[in-house]
Amino acid sequence: SETCYPVKLIYGHIQQLIDQKVDYIFLPSIHTMKHEKSRVKHNYGCVYMQTAAVSIAKALDIESKGITLLSPVFDLDFGQEAMASAMLGLSRILGIPKPFCAKALLSGAMAVRRHTAAVEKQGKALLATLKPEDKILVLITRNYGVSDPILNMGIPELLLERGYKVITLSHLPGHALDIADEYENLYYPFGQHILSGAKLIAHHPNLYAVYLTNHGCGPDTMLSHLFKQEMGDKPYLQIDVDEHFSNVGVITRIEAFLNSLNHRPVEVLPKDFVLEQVDIRPCHLPAVPEKDFPLWLPPLGEYTASLTGYFRAQGVDAHALPHLSAHALSLGRAETSAKEYLPFPALLGGILAQQEVDPAPAQFLIPQTRGAEADGQYARVIRAVLDR
């Protein structure tokens, strides 16, 4: 089936290694992740980050080619002990003494921390030297998109060639921001970092975002709506990366964006400006319906009638939304980018159609999960769309 663009590239990378007749392929499966400011029970990568290693190895049948897959399961949300346990298990397979493996693991972790601190320090130093007329472009994407020239389509070099300073999301203190009150159920750490970065960029008049999303990425389809809300009236360039991109088309979009920035008025920073002092707009999505407003339930198959009856027994004026119509779907698609999975514009369109019929205050039931697929973000994103 169709996968996101980064997973397609993993297929290619592994095939290259097969052609080189390697003995081992190291590709971890990342189950949970870590974000210091997150308040969700667990943080997750996408489903592909959890399953790509094993599924691709099976699809390419690497075992029959004499290649061993080394794919420890990383539960970064469970702390250092879980990480150590996953990595130390490789020492037996590779015939490496555990103390040697533990030392390498510790050295690697320390190197990552030093690098993270150094990059943020570098970004802070750059921002301190800016003149009012300076315009800095911030590349917004996940870490692997920053370093892979195929995933970023050479855009950093194209921007540098045109005389602009370019930094990455890692140069900004996004990890220090606590946005949990605004995004209670955002279980993607990279999503938390991207939206924190959006707040910082929107707040600083000299910073402008170049936001790279990946074709076929479920989380990106949701984050794009929230990113747009964060940027408000500030212009930014968003490019969806896939294998069909045209270099000429990318250059045309870049030059149009840069030309628009040249016409932006110069804004002088206040002397007491603090980058991290951004607006946090709490957004609480209640789990229990109120009795003062009608409650509309989306189509849930045979459960719709049961849930409607249950809520009515609790004193809530509950109703089932009509079955999806072509008009409702068109309303949903008008508010989306055509990259979202079909259930999202269908659900959104049903709500918008009902609001057309009766614009009075109402409640809509949108069940949500706590990881790791995109549907767990539907409620928050629909709230953002309704707030436009």
Q: PLM features: what roles do these ranges have?
A:
Residues 1-388:
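An N-terminal assembly and electron-transfer interface module characteristic of large anaerobic redox
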